[in-house]
Amino acid sequence: MTQAEKGDAENGKEKGGEKEKEQRGVKRPIVPALVPESLQEQIQSNFIVVIHPGSTTLRLGRATDTLPVSVPHVIARRHKQQGQPLYKDNWLLREGLNKPESNEQRQNGLKMVDQAIWSKKMSNGTRRIPVSPEQTRSYNKQMRPAILDHCSGNKWTNTSQQPEYLVGEEALYVNPLDCYNIHWPIRRGQLNIHPGPGGSLTAVLADIEVIWSHAIQKYLEIPLKDLKYYRCILLIPDIYNKQHVKELVHMILMKMGFAGIVVHQESVCATFGSGLSSTCVVDVGDQKTSVCCVEDGVSHRNTRLCLAYGGSDVSRCFYWLMQRAGFPYRECQLTNKMDCLLLQHLKETFCHLDQDISGLQDHEFQIRHPDSPALLYQFRLGDEKLQAPMALFYPATFGIVGQKMTTLQHRSQGDPEDPHDEHYLLATQSKQEQSAKATADRKSASKPIGFEGDLRGQSSDLPERLHSQEVDLASSQGDCLMAGNESEEALTALMSRKTAISLFEGKALGLDKAILHSVDCCSSDDTKKKMYSSILVVGGGLMFHKAQEFLQHRILNKMPPSFRRIIENVDVITRPKDMDPRLIAWKGGAVLACLDTTQELWIYQREWQRFGVRMLRERAAFVW
């Protein structure tokens, strides 16, 4: 046989082998064929879409993009029948604002804010002279708008073609007289499940699928039929609902048709985006604020807490303070989308945390509502610009009554599709383990728990008891049957812990106290020292002038004295690498897409189809 014939025979064998592999079901590469090896890495990142869904804004883009696309996370759906009542999810309004105690709570919160402003001296060593609303009210009430133009330049979204739905900016600018319902599918970081129209889990997931698919097609220019070539990185909250995450993963893989997915927590992605290995991550969003300590890519479960307030609450508080000062735009309504956008803009423009800016100052703003003249208002403000953002540290000022304001990490409700969840592990524990656990619970609950007052005065065992999560009541009742009289005490201990946690979650912690609580929940003093030394602030809710210095001052003053002596500097980072703090977590998701270790985290469509939620337990980079 000649050399050429030998070569042909070998080529034939290779082709035959490839055919055999295909028949045996070896996975084909996700990247389209005929790609030179040198471009493989680049193409892989280019074929990964990073999605960071927020309560108000959706951020998404390819992993290779410098910045993500930001889209209002809202959808307008056309009425199916004529005469259907209009429905719209609230933006700045929320439950618990119109209770009899709300106004008294607001006033008490404002007194604490004023006391804090007066107690901190300005940089020249003098105290601020407070400005009362009466000093501005008479001036502001005299002000009348000047007409800049008879046409504002803005228009309502054209709905003459009667589209079934509108997404993002188009949904925000739907005329209120048109027959469309407005839905925000995520509220306070969780799926917006409610008893009203469009509030079922199925309806919310359908809204999310439409918004994300529309954004991918319009802004990333990826046809939906090509998503089988793409993979997705999804950012989820630190305190997540397992059922909701499972449904989102199912939607992305099985309905939208992505080839694979990696799910990771926002706080860990924020550390990737900022280039920090260990830090206390403070994510102040529009609707919620989450705090947790991250060390070497791991979010410590017992340090996580979520506060049910954010930037939109500051906007609403600023409106209340401006009303006290005679706000000249008297037609402003919190139920009007255009006015909500205006109030958000005024907060971002005028509010600050700079003690040195004091006294009365003149300001002006424009109103450019669709199909209305452009108006110019002039008005005068004093301390209101500082008081509103300080409500984040004194949340009683928001006037929210009877709502759960703080969420800790709890044991999940269990999932019948997940055979190795915590409920299964509890049920299969030996009697000795259960008895030992009951005794430990009894001992821990016998100690007094003080939730009132400043957190720095509390004993160090508080975090340990809070982070141990709620013990499953059914398993405790099982202990009662096995352990006799001892188990009655254990059940009492369990109930007292549940009551303590319930009391704690009913209180609205200020941002500084939440950070101190989170750090105090770390397991060792070395870790606590690391966290006090590095506090990373992300999200758009604390983007105020001098916020960095203000937060640093409050943490230093309230830190336990034992740490104040040994920590040289509390480093509060509000703009890592000079990046917009709202984009840090998304950027971290893009970094995650490029890491070699991420290859082990992908969950593929076929695997999900076969094994379901068990793949999250196997592949997630955090404890599922």
Swiss-Prot record:
Write out the entry's keywords from A to Z: Acetylation, ATP-binding, Cell cycle, Cell division, Chromosome, DNA damage, DNA recombination, DNA repair, Mitosis, Nucleotide-binding, Nucleus, Phosphoprotein, Transcription, Transcription regulation
Name the segments for region: Disordered.
1-29, 430-462
Record InterPro entries:
Actin, ATPase_NBD
Is DNA damage found in the keyword set?
yes
- Work out whether the entry's keyword set contains rRNA-binding: no
What positions belong to coiled-coil segments? none
User: What are the GO BP annotations of this UniProt entry?
Assistant: cell division; chromatin remodeling; DNA recombination; DNA repair; positive regulation of DNA repair; positive regulation of DNA-templated transcription; positive regulation of telomere maintenance in response to DNA damage; regulation of cell cycle
Q: What does this protein do?
A: Plays an important role in the functional organization of mitotic chromosomes. Exhibits low basal ATPase activity, and unable to polymerize. Proposed core component of the chromatin remodeling INO80 complex which is involved in transcriptional regulation, DNA replication and probably DNA repair. Required for the recruitment of INO80 (and probably the INO80 complex) to sites of DNA damage Strongly prefer nucleosomes and H3-H4 tetramers over H2A-H2B dimers, suggesting it may act as a nucleosome recognition module within the complex.
Q: Which family does it belong to?
A: Belongs to the actin family. ARP8 subfamily.
Q: What is this protein called?
A: Actin-related protein 8
Q: Which organism is it from?
A: Mus musculus
